[in-house]
Amino acid sequence: MAMGEALRAAAADAVVTFLWVLCVSTLGASTTAVTSYLRLQGVHFALLVTVSLLSVLLFVFNILCDALGGASFNPTGVAAFYAAGVTSPSLFSIALRLPAQAAGAVGGALAISELMPAQYRHMLGGPSLKVDPHTGAGAELVLTFVITLAVLLIIVKGPRNPIIKTWMISICTLCLVLSGAAYTGPSMNPANAFGWAYVNNRHNTWEQFYVYWICPFIGAILAAWIFRAMFLTPPPKPKAKKA
């Protein structure tokens, strides 16, 4: 990949990640607003609204990412699709895209912190560690492993209908968010975690790097390798020509 293409990919990732963090951070407030307006009570209604909003958000961002040439808002997604052999960006391009995503996330977190109405501002804050670092790191590794494997299966081997794909990813994401809420927030997206850590002045700690960067990458790459070994058929070997 040429320098210009790599820079364009990094810029696209920065923009998409900025918009993603800006939008996804409003899910809690949006769910509250919708359920209050429709006078819906009960956790099951709140979960249904959240899944629906997340599905719409993912569907829109899938279109946006495709329009920008395959942009991404999750560093582990870039690494996983590369490790699985689904995409083949250059390592130089990846080296530019990951910090661009982190910078975009910082911008998105700062922007929504200013734009969010005062009555919903307490719902912001991003993922935070609620257990000891090793337990939190293990939780992020497992959660990122599961969501990465699920996303690869749904996108590469799942149904062709993009709406069904988006709905399946939304349900998987919400289930894992609820499962990891008591451990790390959770994040499953190092850029998103970094953006909020920067806002809360926790971005330059070993704990942040260990829990929200190292272990999610390990989980994502392990999932990609397993997916590649189990679900991607290797190309047939050319037959040797007879002398």
UniProtKB/Swiss-Prot annotation:
State the encoding gene. SIP1-2
Q: Where is this motif: NPA 2?
A: 189-191
Taxonomically, what lineage is the organism? Eukaryota, Viridiplantae, Streptophyta, Embryophyta, Tracheophyta
Q: What is this protein called?
A: Aquaporin SIP1-2
Mind telling me which residue stretches traverse the membrane in this protein?
A: 9-29, 45-65, 98-118, 136-156, 163-183, 211-231
What this chain does, per the entry, is described as: Aquaporins facilitate the transport of water and small neutral solutes across cell membranes.
Instruction: Tell me the organism.
Output: Zea mays
Domain free text:
Aquaporins contain two tandem repeats each containing three membrane-spanning domains and a pore-forming loop with the signature motif Asn-Pro-Ala (NPA).
Give a Pfam family name: MIP
What is the protein's major site of localization? membrane
